[in-house]
């Protein structure tokens, strides 16, 4: 049970360090933007990919 509390505290510390550090936040936002663009491209091609076929 004690290990569970320690891991929660570690997760809180990780979240705090990732969100409140400006350099890490900028990198995380770039990664999120890239992931969003990739997911959007996959959805677009799944929906309208047959229209691109020649």
Swiss-Prot record:
The keyword Transmembrane applies. Keywords: Membrane, Mitochondrion, Mitochondrion outer membrane, Protein transport, Transmembrane, Transmembrane helix, Transport. It comes from the Eukaryota. One of its GO terms (biological process) is protein transport. The chain crosses the membrane at residues 31-48. A component of the complex responsible for the recognition and translocation of cytosolically synthesized mitochondrial preproteins. Forms part of the receptor complex that consists of at least 6 different proteins (TOM5, TOM6, TOM7, TOM20, TOM22/TOM9 and TOM40). Belongs to the Tom5 family. This is Mitochondrial import receptor subunit TOM5 homolog. It comes from Arabidopsis thaliana (Mouse-ear cress).
């Amino acid at each position: 049970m004690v290990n569970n509390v320690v891991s929660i505290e570690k997760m809180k510390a990780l979240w705090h360090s990732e969100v409140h550090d400006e350099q890490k936040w900028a990198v995380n936002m770039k990664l999120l933007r890239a992931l969003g663009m990739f997911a959007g491209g996959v959805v677009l091609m799944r929906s309208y990919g047959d229209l691109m076929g020649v």
